[in-house]
């Protein structure tokens, strides 16, 4: 079929949420003429649920996005109202930053960034179809009949795909926050041959700040110590007048109200069909599943400086409006609270992610990429990370350059994508530190060391950032080398000082680096014995030095595991392999291999239901028969 196109682009991104924004900024910054199409310009980078960025594992993803040259970290650093480092009492592998956002300012600032970006056209329009010829994308069709040509298309439609809002007995077609749903595109993705799933998520009610009795709640302030998501942000710009959050709890009266109205709850009446998020359940789900708990935490989170709206984190619900009011008024501090918005559930279509490659390109259609909640994930950060990778690979494909695949040992983004394309997901996927087997090397403090060079190579890290990174890396490397070269000897003068500090004396000579491996010896103590570095070191470099030195043994073990897995990842599986021709392989493994069609032995070994014996048989088969090459 011959199409008459009215406009032509290298890449078209459908949807301007957190995934779409990162995808379109990446493609345009890499030199591709890009169209970012959205149903509503006023919803660009909007936060339809929680007014926050970061958190456990998620905060590390934002740092990774920033290190690669993405925008989320820079934008939240300009628009936060509170910043807090989580898990400070635990090891460095699980520490993560979380910011309360001024949600309207966050969206407005991101819109300004997109509007000013060269090579990027922003358009309010609804895309109804993906145009495909001979198994590859050629463009899109709008609801008004316009055809735009494209060499690659990135679908980042969030919860808009056949979205339906559910509130008590009320159910109607809608995207998030009462935006338009994308129904025709959902139908046409299915017609293209993609396997579609149905998920559900929800949001809590918002209450009016001036109607809250804060005296009955517990204050939750931000941190005084400066922290940032972007490696380019300065401590001098750290916000002093942060806005606190507040903690309260449900109680037995709250639980009674919910239990008495479960027959009206869409989650239990059969109205909701989609699968909901395990790690962000509705309050009615929590009351039923954890009936023995006397109370559940609720955090009152301001949605910005210039609004009275307060987000009641932990109270996600789709109960009828009258029940929500009674529920709110049963909670300490909210007895007279005015509900400004009701909570609701939203059901939406997803593209089942086992149909994707690790580049986030669909296996079925060349040049078609998907990212974000479209792939079955939950969370702004997960969406942004996928959007960035999908955008990068769309641009690389258009330019005929090698693809970018982040491994599980490279980034949490790599862990997430590998989980999605290798294991799929039966529920909205959320990143957790427990999902990362190499989490000690995927830390908050070293994201730039892991990923900035990759961002530079693909063209997303500019000269200013690259220069700052080189200075930091050189200072780190030089000081690490210096600490490893200076010896402390167990002489009386040294041991007297060590004992005066309350520490065990030295019995053998050791380097300053070895001295720092002692749990009680921090960098400041070590340099008091060996003298300071040639130049003043930033606090973040000192933190990185302490972590790398104190956990060196564990880090080395992790890197050894990475090296072993790398050998598995380098063993490719032909695209045209006949799984039925492999004798002795278990039936479950054969079925999973057919469904996932893994690209490497490493990926095959991570598929659930596949055991080591299956992998051994597969490797023997490939050594004798695997001559073909995978092509896309």
UniProtKB/Swiss-Prot annotation:
InterPro entries: FAD/NAD-bd_sf, GIDA_C_N, MnmG, MnmG-rel, MnmG-rel_CS, MnmG_C, MnmG_C_subdom, MnmG_C_subdom_sf
Keyword tRNA processing recorded: yes
Binding residues for FAD: 15-20, 127, 182, 373
Location(s) in or outside the cell: Cytoplasm
Disulfide bond entries: none
Keyword terms of this UniProt record: Cytoplasm, FAD, Flavoprotein, NAD, tRNA processing
Cofactor: FAD
GO cellular component, one term: cytosol
GO biological process, one term: tRNA wobble uridine modification
Function: NAD-binding protein involved in the addition of a carboxymethylaminomethyl (cmnm) group at the wobble position (U34) of certain tRNAs, forming tRNA-cmnm(5)s(2)U34.
Protein name (record): tRNA uridine 5-carboxymethylaminomethyl modification enzyme MnmG
Species assigned in the record: Streptococcus pyogenes serotype M2 (strain MGAS10270)
Lineage, uppermost ranks: Bacteria, Bacillati, Bacillota, Bacilli, Lactobacillales
């Amino acid at each position: 079929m011959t199409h008459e196109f009215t406009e032509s682009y290298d890449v078209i991104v459908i949807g301007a949420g957190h995934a779409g924004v990162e995808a379109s900024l990446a493609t345009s910054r890499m030199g591709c003429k890009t169209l970012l199409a959205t149903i509503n310009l006023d919803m660009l980078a909007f936060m339809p649920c929680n007014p926050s960025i970061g958190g456990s594992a998620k905060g590390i993803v934002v740092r990774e996005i920033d290190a690669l040259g993405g925008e989320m970290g820079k934008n939240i650093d300009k628009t936060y109202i509170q910043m807090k480092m989580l898990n400070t009492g635990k090891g460095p592998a699980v520490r993560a930053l979380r910011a309360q956002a001024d949600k309207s300012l966050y969206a407005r600032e991101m819109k300004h960034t997109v509007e000013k970006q060269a090579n990027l056209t922003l358009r309010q329009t609804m895309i109804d179809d993906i145009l495909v010829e001979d198994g590859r994308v050629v463009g899109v069709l709008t609801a008004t009949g316009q055809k735009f040509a494209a060499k690659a298309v990135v679908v980042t439609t969030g919860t808009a795909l056949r979205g339906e809002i559910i509130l008590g007995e009320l159910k109607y077609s809608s995207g998030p926050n009462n935006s338009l749903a994308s129904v025709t595109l959902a139908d046409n993705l299915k017609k293209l041959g993609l396997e579609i799933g149905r998920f559900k998520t929800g949001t809590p009610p918002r209450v009016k700040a001036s109607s809250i009795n804060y005296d009955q709640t517990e204050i939750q302030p931000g941190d005084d110590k400066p922290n940032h998501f972007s490696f380019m942000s300065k401590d001098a710009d750290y916000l002093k007048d942060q806005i606190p959050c507040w903690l309260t709890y449900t109680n037995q009266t709250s639980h009674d109200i919910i239990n008495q109205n479960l027959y009206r709850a869409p989650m239990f009446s059969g109205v909701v069909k989609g699968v909901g998020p395990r790690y962000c359940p509705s309050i009615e789900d929590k009351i039923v599943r954890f009936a023995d708990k006397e109370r559940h935490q609720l955090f009152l989170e301001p949605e910005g400086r210039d609004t009275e709206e307060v987000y009641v984190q932990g109270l996600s619900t789709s109960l009828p409006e009258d029940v929500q009011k009674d529920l709110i008024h049963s909670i300490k501090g909210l007895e007279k609270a005015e509900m400004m918005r009701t909570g609701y559930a939203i059901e939406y279509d997803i593209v089942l992610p086992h149909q994707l490659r690790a580049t986030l390109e669909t296996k079925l259609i060349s040049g078609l990429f998907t990212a974000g909640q479209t792939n079955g994930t939950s969370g702004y950060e997960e969406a942004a990370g996928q959007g960035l990778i999908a955008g990068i690979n769309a641009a690389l494909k258009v330019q005929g350059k090698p693809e970018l695949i982040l491994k599980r040992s490279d980034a949490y983004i790599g862990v997430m994508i590998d989980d999605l394309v290798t294991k799929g997901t039966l529920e909205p996927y959320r990143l957790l530190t427990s999902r990362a087997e190499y989490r000690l090397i995927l830390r908050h403090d070293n994201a730039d060391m892991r990923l900035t060079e990759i961002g530079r190579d693909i063209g997303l890290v500019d000269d200013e950032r690259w220069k700052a990174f080189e200075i930091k890396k050189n200072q780190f490397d030089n000081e690490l080398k210096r600490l490893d070269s200076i010896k402390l000897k167990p002489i009386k003068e040294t041991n007297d000082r060590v004992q005066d500090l309350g520490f065990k004396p030295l019995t053998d000579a050791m380097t300053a680096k070895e001295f720092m491996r002692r749990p009680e010896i921090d960098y400041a103590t070590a340099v008091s014995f060996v003298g300071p570095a040639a130049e003043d070191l930033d606090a973040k470099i000192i933190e990185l030095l302490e972590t790398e030195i104190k956990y060196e043994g564990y880090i080395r073990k992790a890197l050894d595991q990475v090296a072993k897995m790398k050998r598995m990842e380098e063993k490719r599986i032909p695209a045209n392999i006949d799984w039925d021709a492999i004798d002795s392989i278990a039936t479950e493994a054969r079925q999973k291999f057919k469904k996932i069609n893994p690209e490497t032995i490493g990926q095959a070994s991570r598929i659930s239901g596949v055991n080591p014996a299956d992998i051994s048989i597969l490797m023997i088969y490939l050594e004798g028969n695997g001559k073909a090459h995978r092509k896309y």
